[in-house]
Amino acid sequence: MQIFIGKIPNHVSEEQIKEYFGQFGEVTDVSLKGTYGFLNFDSEGSITRVLNQRTHSIDGAPISVERANGRKRPLDGEYHDRYMDMGRGGYSPHRDYRGFRNAPYPPMRYESRSPGRYDPRFSDRYGGRSPEYRGDSFRMGDPQRSRDFCEYCNACPIHGMRDMMDSRKRHHMSRDHPNNHLKVVFENIAPNTAIEDFKNFVQDHGFEPSYARLGYSGNHAVFEFKNIEDKDNAMKKLDGAEFNGHILKTRSYLSKDEYKSRERESHMRSELQPTDNGEAEPQGTTTDIYEGIEDAKAEND
């Protein structure tokens, strides 16, 4: 059970690091690699307590902490990178092959060109064939070359034929989580708040969330409830409540498309404000129509 620590200042010693992280649990091993290093804990709970705290600083210097991914290079990776490199397209005139003098055998130069878009033997990525293969000329509205081919839309007298450059085909609604309408965002929470402490606070008020996590900026949390009634009651009861000396604010979770739509509307309203003479005057500042809406940029599942 290992975590990664980065941005370690030069004046911070190994003893200081072990003493600081010892408050979260027993540190079994410390391995420093200069400005970064790795810590081993005796239990998974210790790592969870470290990661729940949003900020860490040692001797006044902030450091970054995250879970170690644990990936390792294969033993034969160095050989392939230095000598063969066959997995990256074979021979290239732009690659330096002077290191091959120590290899068992030099690389073989060969042509590895992939089939082109109009190669008559292969179909393109959208299911069509090359013009030479089909025997017709290339057209932007060719149904076989359309990204979202539809028998109805290509024959519809109202819609007509849509080619691959049609904006209605290139832009789709974002796929958000189906339970976003059951989520509540609690803003203005105290820094370094553990998610378990805040979850216990919500449960003490009679609500049982099905999902909870801290926001990426560290000053808000996202809770998901089982139904709309619990969500509405939690927003009404906990809005203005005090937690660790901070007054909480609640709002509904904004999906990506809803956030973009409200931000666009807010920007248009702030840019064109009518003056006394009836003319539109650009404003220097932009005010969001929803307080705390900037935090929704990072709140996407």
UniProtKB/Swiss-Prot annotation:
UniProt keyword list: mRNA processing, mRNA splicing, Nucleus, Repeat, RNA-binding
UniProt record, GO biological process: mRNA processing; RNA splicing
Chain segments annotated as transmembrane: none
Disordered: region residues: 106-140, 255-301
Keyword Endoplasmic reticulum carried by entry: no
GO cellular component: cytoplasm; nucleus
Annotated Pfam families: RRM_1
SMART domains named in the record: RRM (SM00360)
Start and end residues of each RRM domain: 1-70, 182-255
Biased segments, Basic and acidic residues type: 110-140, 255-270
Main location per the UniProt record: nucleus
Keyword NADP on entry: no
Molecular function in Gene Ontology: mRNA binding
Entry superkingdom: Eukaryota
Localization annotation: Nucleus
Family the entry assigns: Belongs to the splicing factor SR family.
Task of the protein: Plays a role in splicing.
Protein name: Probable splicing factor ECU05_1440
Source organism (scientific name): Encephalitozoon cuniculi (strain GB-M1) (Microsporidian parasite)
Top-level taxonomy: Eukaryota, Fungi, Fungi incertae sedis, Microsporidia, Unikaryonidae
